[in-house]
Curated annotation (Swiss-Prot):
This is Anthranilate phosphoribosyltransferase. It catalyses: N-(5-phospho-beta-D-ribosyl)anthranilate + diphosphate = 5-phospho-alpha-D-ribose 1-diphosphate + anthranilate. It is an enzyme of class 2 (transferase). Homodimer. Catalyzes the transfer of the phosphoribosyl group of 5-phosphorylribose-1-pyrophosphate (PRPP) to anthranilate to yield N-(5'-phosphoribosyl)-anthranilate (PRA). Pathway: Amino-acid biosynthesis; L-tryptophan biosynthesis; L-tryptophan from chorismate: step 2/5. GO terms for cellular component: cytosol. Anthranilate 2 binds at R163. The lineage of its organism: Bacteria, Bacillati, Bacillota, Bacilli, Bacillales. Its EC number is 2.4.2.18. Anthranilate 1 binds at G78, N109. It comes from Staphylococcus carnosus (strain TM300). GO terms for molecular function: anthranilate phosphoribosyltransferase activity; magnesium ion binding.
Amino acid sequence: MTLIQKIQQQNNLTQQDINEFIQTLINPDIENEEKASLLSEYTNRPLNQVEVTYLVQAMIQTMYPVQPVYPEAMCVCGTGGDKSNSFNISTTVSFVVAAANVNVLKHGNKSITSASGSSDLLNKMGIAATHVPDVEGRMNETGLAFLNATDTYPVMKHIQPIRKMMDGPTIFNILGPMIHPYKLDYQVVGVFNPDFVKAMAETLYDLKRKRAIVLHGANGMDEATLSGDNLIYEVNQETGVTSYYLNAEDVGLKPAANGTLRGGTPAENLEITLDILTGKDHSSKRDVVVLNAGIALYVSEKADSIKEGVQLAQQLIDDGKAFEQYKKTGGQVYDHIG
């Protein structure tokens, strides 16, 4: 039976099947149309948590048979694919979290489904992506490094064109946040589809994350939002996986519609980020950064609760530490952003 037949029959796939699937997609000698057909069939399958773990392991093995380690490293990222065109929330959050002396290794990409992905924004900031061999030196110096997925996984260049051919998110939106080249201790992942949250949390547990939160934002975003109840799956290597809902009002923040979080071009998003980090912006955009930073500070054990994490995030912005972290990381400040 061929691989595509196995996928179509929706039988459970073995690790060997999954390895074949990944190897087919990254093979430059196979036509993109054939790969797109295979990826489309797989994306339309019901999500299988065991297969997700196999997929993550297969992707990591293509480049990192032995994953590098940096002590107490954390990543904060979203799957993308929510089509909200929000500003770069998780990139902005990274500066706030790193300002609390959390070792943030953010793994990001160029945008596929919005006007400005994290790599597009970093380019505008003047912050270069860190190559894996340089991570340790960069982290020792600044406590924050940005890794570009096309650099950490050059094989992805064979997959990106197929993803662009497809209408909407694929299985790679789910895998992207979990194939971090580093073996992380802490992670926060925002997910565009609530049906995927549990499987991704269980996969992070299988990958031995010390603590993590996988969440789906109220009203369909891949970040925690201010517009209602956010679905949270919390991972703790000692106690397992638990789920609950979190409302921004529970942690002292005002409700706001997701539409108030819209971003734009990389230049517009940079202006939004700088206004937040310098304490100029007190709108819902600041609040959503504070909420997501609060979650990350709780996960990374800098706060005993998300509410305490939110208070710490506010303090880091108000004290100027978040903006100091931005400059320490190499972020440029412009009189006029264009």
